[in-house]
Amino acid sequence: MNNFIGIGKIVDSAENGRVLKFDLAIQQERPCFVPCILFDPTDEVKESVDQLQTKNRVVWLQGRVSMNEFEYQGRTIRKIQVVTYANGIRPI
């Protein structure tokens, strides 16, 4: 089963067409920034994410872990991110 649940603050959100990317800042001894992506977000979800980031609110986030692998300048690059579920972001 591939299930990610995290609690943190949304930072660095950016919309690019049908994709919303952001980081989930998880507070620990050293903050951990988890890259997240949300496909085809509704206007309501986009506005909600923007408000949660602006108000610096702590959120509960659920999604699945995804790894992309590609070649760049002869090197294999691996990128891990959380594909967030549309209803998987809730303020705490």
Each language-model region and where it sits:
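Single-stranded nucleic acid-binding surfaces, predominantly the OB-fold ssDNA-binding core
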Residues: M1-I92
